[in-house]
């Protein structure tokens, strides 16, 4: 079964058994929520729709975006991302990973953001058997 792996430089820290997810975060300066929907494929993470509740420093709304229910909705045609690299520091706050109609902070899988480990990568992977104690599967 394909799922989502979290880690860095190919080292798997955690596995999430979902074929689709939303990555959400709050912009550090503008304090505006941003969400991106992804589909997990063998080729990588395919970005579907993205939503942002406003605009500001470094977050210009793309041409063709539609304002619906208080958020700008848009789609970009990008090749699959394998891996998707995220900056993750205590100062910037954490990301949320949403699937099965629930959102959890990445810290639920990885512990809190740390200055000594300022990045994490997400990629599509074949999930390991649940009997293996590491990496964790939730």
Task: Show which residues each predicted segment covers.
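Short N-terminal edge-element motif at the start of the domain
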Residues: 1-6, 12
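N-terminal secretory signal peptides
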Residues: 11-62
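Mature, soluble, non-transmembrane domains
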Residues: 60-138
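Secondary-structure transition/turn motif
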Residues: 7-10, 49-53, 76-80, 101
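Short acidic, glycine-rich loop/turn motifs
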Residues: 6-8, 25-29, 99-101
């Amino acid at each position: 079964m394909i799922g989502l792996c979290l880690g860095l430089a190919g080292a798997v820290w955690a596995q999430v058994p979902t074929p689709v997810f939303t990555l959400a975060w709050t912009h550090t300066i503008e304090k505006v929520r941003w969400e991106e929907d992804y589909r997990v494929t063998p080729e990588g993470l395919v970005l579907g729709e993205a939503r942002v509740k406003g605009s500001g420093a470094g977050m210009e709304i793309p041409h063709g975006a539609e304002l619906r229910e208080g958020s700008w909705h848009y789609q970009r045609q990008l090749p699959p991302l394998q891996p998707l690299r995220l900056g993750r520091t205590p100062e910037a706050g954490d990301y949320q990973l949403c699937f099965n109609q629930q959102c959890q902070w990445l810290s639920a899988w990885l512990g809190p953001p740390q200055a000594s480990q300022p990045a994490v990568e997400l990629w599509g992977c074949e999930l390991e058997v649940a009997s293996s104690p590491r990496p964790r599967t939730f």
